[in-house]
Amino acid sequence: MKGGKRVQPARPNRINKEIRATEVRLTGVDGEQIGIVSLNEALEKAEEAGVDLVEISPNAEPPVCRIMDYGKFLYEKSKSTKEQKKKQKVIQVKEIKFRPGTDDGDYQVKLRNLIRFLEDGDKAKITLRFRGREMAHQQIGMEVLNRVRKDLCEDSDLAVVESFPTRIEGRQMIMVLAPKKRQ
């Protein structure tokens, strides 16, 4: 639609003339309680201070309003939500694939990568794939998984086993390790 009017997004808080109550519980600029006053008196006080009257909790009886700079309030609110998002760590599941015949050199490289994943706080999924005639030697695959478990959980105390395969699923065995919580 060309040339149409842009709809303003609804504000989460009503301000100044948008407040519909006749009486409000007023809080000052510094957070001090002023008490229950009429809406006109509250608007006058906000105008004297050169800031806005913002309805904080509209469902209260009477509604709670605060005298504050609304633009600054929105900025602080968005800043704090961004800060909270930044602090949240998304735990990823990283996968390393082994084969029953994985050589020692390759095993060490994959083990180093697993250690790095666990130190970064990510979970590690170890997939052991069987091809062709390897299916007849599933005990070799279990030995590889037990070796990984011994190296990471028992010897270095880096991880805890979240799930350990008891049998083969399709043509693979899957073990999941989670990083150990540090005190």
From Swiss-Prot:
Molecular function terms from GO: ribosome binding; translation initiation factor activity
UniProt keyword Cytoplasm present: yes
Domain of life: Bacteria
Gene Ontology biological process terms from the UniProt entry: ribosome disassembly
Listed Pfam families: IF3_C, IF3_N
Keywords: Cytoplasm, Initiation factor, Protein biosynthesis
Any one GO cellular component localisation term in the record: cytosol
Major localisation: cytoplasm
Location in or out of the cell: Cytoplasm
Annotated function: IF-3 binds to the 30S ribosomal subunit and shifts the equilibrium between 70S ribosomes and their 50S and 30S subunits in favor of the free subunits, thus enhancing the availability of 30S subunits on which protein synthesis initiation begins.
Oligomer status and interactors: Monomer.
Matching PANTHER family: TRANSLATION INITIATION FACTOR IF-3, TRANSLATION INITIATION FACTOR IF-3, MITOCHONDRIAL
Family: Belongs to the IF-3 family.
Listed name of the protein: Translation initiation factor IF-3
Organism name: Yersinia pseudotuberculosis serotype O:1b (strain IP 31758)
